[in-house]
Amino acid sequence: MESIGIFFGSDTGNTENVAKLIHKYIGTNISSIHDIANTNKKDIELFNILIFGVSTWYYGELQCDWDDFLPTLKKINFNNKIIALFGCGDQEDYSEYFCDGIGILYNVIRLSKNVRFIGSWTSKGYSFECSKALDKNKNFLGLVIDEDRQPEQSNQRIIQWTKKIKTELNSLLN
């Protein structure tokens, strides 16, 4: 399997911790992990398979490092790349903006031709009012983690999602 680049932005450490677990469960021999705060355009362009992790802040805003990187992200050509997204959010205190960061990244990346997204995730088991991270079938565009309200479910969700990612990658690459 090709090398997978895992890029995350984190203020509190939650998204970084999720990224580290994804790195572990995907396989440290086939993936590398990068803080978006120390990333440039070329770092991302090296990979054909990318996993982006973002948290949502305040009223549906990107985590600050992703917000700073957004102009660069818009310049990257994601044609023929495979993308998976994950995010952290608080479904109780920010129920109207739950994990909107995933949707913001998705809407930038999807403008590239032939980009493939993998890793959609069920919205069952979460309680929120609204999210930009939902697709037309009301599934999340990627893995959603709520360390504030459901920390006991995080590890199992990450394990299940990384298995799903591996299965989807195997079918796309074989």
UniProtKB/Swiss-Prot annotation:
InterPro entries: Flavodoxin (IPR050619), Flavodoxin/NO_synth (IPR008254), Flavodoxin_CS (IPR001226), Flavodoxin_lc (IPR010086), Flavoprotein-like_sf (IPR029039). Residues 4-166 form the Flavodoxin-like domain. Keywords: Electron transport, Flavoprotein, FMN, Transport. Its cofactor is FMN. Pfam families: Flavodoxin_1. It comes from the Bacteria. One of its GO terms (molecular function) is electron transfer activity. Low-potential electron donor to a number of redox enzymes. Belongs to the flavodoxin family. This is Flavodoxin. It comes from Buchnera aphidicola subsp. Baizongia pistaciae (strain Bp). The gene is fldA.
